[in-house]
């Protein structure tokens, strides 16, 4: 597989509906996909929610219809496409894996059947539109399980049955077409957390998959050395290619406290455009340093967001656009040419 230099661009339909414009360094207004492709991005990740219309805060975005429209734009640009099933009507992450409203009253057997059918049918529909994903995630950051409470850890047996249902649904839809199945966990720099999950899951009968995907945010998930060692050990243990499918760093200090000064120190790089680019360069090089080209890419999580006055959260300082919608230097990291840095030396963190 070509080294994936990717971004999660799931917010684009919502931002475009709100009239947000993105600009190149010289102020030229550009289509977001044209802009990121210009600077080396060759893959786009999208999340899909089952029925976001059930959750007012979702705005109805990340539906199948939005996914299909975005997938067609991605393919028109000749880029690869990763689809991230959340198996929820809204956000799913280690702290919340809420079942879709339509699945709340299903028996466990019915829930497994729903996961299989929904995965198969969604991917089959995309395949019929000639936009079958290149990679599909069975759940989002499922280190604590998925579809709570049924698939919540420490019950590996039930969780694995649900994950297997998703894997089977994906395989059934793909048929003879090439589509890789990914398992995605957070805590990318915490080897023992991840080893515990994989060992427990395989012992419970986890079926074969193709890729390991990690979330790695340097202010939350360990040092860059931790990331390198974790990825290397996971490759040794499980013989699977690996990607960092979520990463990011701040380009300015947070007024509203999303990333505070202590977290900035933990990350080891300043919350500046230069610091943001340094982090991305380093993550890319760590992934490329994996043996036998088993490090296969990285994705920035939601870079296309424009901060608004008085608004906190991710858009305040974590995207790759400034308050005018102009692209920041971090995007230049995606012009990266992967080389196998077998003896990569990592920098000392800031004190």
Predicted features and spans:
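Conserved small/polar residues in nucleotide/adenosyl-binding loops
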Residues: 341-348
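Active-site cleft segment of glycoside hydrolase catalytic domains centered on the general acid/base Glu
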Residues: 64-65, 94-199, 222-229, 310, ...
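Short, acidic/polar
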Residues: 22-36, 119-122, 191-201, 283
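Conserved, mostly hydrophobic/aromatic
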Residues: 7, 84, 136, 212, ...
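Substrate-binding cleft of secreted/luminal carbohydrate-active enzymes
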Residues: 245-247, 266-338
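Surface-exposed, active-site-proximal loop segments in enzymatic domains
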Residues: 17-21, 50-67, 89-112, 142-153, ...
